[in-house]
């Protein structure tokens, strides 16, 4: 008689690249997810996009689906004044940089960002804080692509290790622009982290990202034509990379707009996505199930 609540952060059927990592275990995780979700009294979806996906993939009454976004602590994620991490990784303080933070996976779309570097205007650095590759194959693909980009452009810094939160916050805080080229992203907490640190975001307009990043206000959303079903790879990957570069170049050439977008992002993160606001919604749902 105890209610079961499940929170969905991603969906296995929409991540077929996990088979590269899990092998036959991928079929088991798909079955386990389906079984758990369909028996739950309530399913928390971290975005409207996730809710639509759950509704289309599983036999769940719409009344059992509830949208409660992920949250953030704006006191932890706020602009940092220190520069130790920049010095540690050889980032030139006198030059602006574009930043990526994330794992090396198909989902995060980092290869499309690396391919966009050839279209970047000169004069700024590119910092790729990217580690934990899903497979040896994608690790090698990343290594080859970055080496090719570095052969043609100076100022590409690849941080291949997973770093702690204070270090990550420092990287966010001093970036001119944060970039999220994900091709599958149910919510995209990294965008929220960057916004809370006062940085503008250029992100792919997929999944739950448009519910976080407000186009033309806290950053830019880049449309991407994708396959209609998983693995959702861009149908025109070269165009997607060029479009990312166009928006990045636009912001990098306009520090005043970067600052305005960054301030708006910080306000939005603190007012809409603080953990106190998210906790109230979560408590209300649990209260409704236990009355």
Where are these regions (language model features)?
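Short hydrophobic beta-strand element within catalytic cores of glycosyltransferases
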Residues: 200-203, 213, 220-221
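Short alpha-helical donor nucleotide-sugar binding micro-motif in glycosyltransferases
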Residues: 170-175
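A conserved mid-protein helix/loop that constitutes part of the nucleotide-sugar donor-binding site
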Residues: 96, 100-119, 140
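Carbohydrate-associated surface elements
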Residues: 49, 71
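Glycosyltransferase donor-sugar binding loop
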Residues: 72, 125-143, 157-161
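Nucleotide-activated donor-binding/catalytic signature segment of Leloir-type glycosyltransferases, i.e.
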Residues: 95, 139-166
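Aromatic "clamp/platform" in nucleotide-sugar-dependent glycosyltransferases that forms part
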Residues: 183
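Nucleotide-sugar donor phosphate/pyrophosphate-binding loop at the beta->alpha transition
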Residues: 2-5, 14-35, 55-56
């Amino acid at each position: 008689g105890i209610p079961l609540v499940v929170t969905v952060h991603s969906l296995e059927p929409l991540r077929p690249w996990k088979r590269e990592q899990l092998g036959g275990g991928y079929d088991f995780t798909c079955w386990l997810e389906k079984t758990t979700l369909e028996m739950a009294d309530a399913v928390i979806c971290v975005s409207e996009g996730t809710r639509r996906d759950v509704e289309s993939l599983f036999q769940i009454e719409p009344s059992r689906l509830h949208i409660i976004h992920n949250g953030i602590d704006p006191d932890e994620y706020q602009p940092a004044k220190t520069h130790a991490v920049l010095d540690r990784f050889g980032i030139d303080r006198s030059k602006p940089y574009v930043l990526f933070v994330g794992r090396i996976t198909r989902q995060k779309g980092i290869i499309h960002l690396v391919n966009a570097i050839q279209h970047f205007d000169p004069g700024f650095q590119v910092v790729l804080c990217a580690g934990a590759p899903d497979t040896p194959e994608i690790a090698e693909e990343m290594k080859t692509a970055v080496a090719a980009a570095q052969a043609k452009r100076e100022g590409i810094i690849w941080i291949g290790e997973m770093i702690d939160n204070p270090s990550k916050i420092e990287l966010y805080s001093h970036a001119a622009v944060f970039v999220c080229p994900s091709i599958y992203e149910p919510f995209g907490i990294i965008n929220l982290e960057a916004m809370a640190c006062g940085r503008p975001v250029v992100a792919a307009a997929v999944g739950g990202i448009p519910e976080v990043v407000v186009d033309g206000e806290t950053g830019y959303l880049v449309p991407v034509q994708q396959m209609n079903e998983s693995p959702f790879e861009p149908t025109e990957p070269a165009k997607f990379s060029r479009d990312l570069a166009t928006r990045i170049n636009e912001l990098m050439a306009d520090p005043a707009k970067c600052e305005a977008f960054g301030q708006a992002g910080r306000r939005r993160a603190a007012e809409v996505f603080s953990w106190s606001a998210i906790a109230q919604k979560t408590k209300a749902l649990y209260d409704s199930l236990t009355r």
